[in-house]
């Protein structure tokens, strides 16, 4: 049976911008693989037991921004201080949404988009 989440796969077009974004969230590159036969690169990043598998590939269609399609909607990362993470992102040049309280838990949270428009939720 399922023991936990193994990794999150992200398809990205902007290598430097994508790495900088996830590094601002504390992720570090742990592996890098170039696949000439597929004309892409896979970069593994880790932070707090969470692994991102970032596929850098040009030529894919851009993410549909709305209306939301069925399937995976967003990725949510748990943090101890959402306001502090939001400030780090702002200082790093990103534009997170306003800090708000989760409707059900009352905990602080916000959304920000990665360089390819993937919604990322930061949640206490």
Predicted regions and their residues:
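Vicinal oxygen chelate
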Residues: 4-14, 33, 42-44, 63-124
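Short secondary-structure capping/turn micro-motifs that flank functional sites
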Residues: 38-39, 55, 105-106
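A short, acidic/glycine-rich surface segment
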Residues: 30-32, 38-41, 59-65, 98
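Core segments of cupin and vicinal oxygen chelate
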Residues: 2, 10-51
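Short, charged/polar surface micro-motifs in flexible loops or helix N-caps
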Residues: 48-52, 59-61, 82-83
